[in-house]
Amino acid sequence: MTLIKTNSPKLHREARLAREKLHLEGEVPDGVLRAEIDASWRRSLSHGVHFNAKHELALESSASLDVLLASNRLLIDAALPAIDYLAERQGKEGLIILANSDATILAVEGRADRLKGSGLQDITLGACWSEAVRGTNALGTALVEALSLIHI
């Protein structure tokens, strides 16, 4: 598991400048971003995902959600003890998300409502967070990079 500190003002400033360059020039600037983020931005561009697009991609019906959860029941059941343990350790402010190999959310524990102010409206069961659909994001990028991450 990799622990990445993401609240550094310098990192935020560099990412903002890189995002502005991407917006103005349509290219990912070389050498500015961490390697995995740089690679993710490039993959997102190749998928045709605009870096500033807003997507809400939950499943269309409760029947689809029932099928999704039923087809992932073994994973969910195996992960529940770990999710409960992490939720206990994190307290009320944390957020734990379990997703399948397609980056579709299967379980959410914690304060997803706290993210709504940052434009993340659909941290919900059945929402897809793959890079190919949404671009760079912690869940989709971790799956592509085959890394488990904790962001603080």
Residues covered by each model-derived region:
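Intrinsically disordered, low-complexity terminal regulatory regions
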Residues: M1-E131, N137-T141, E145-L149
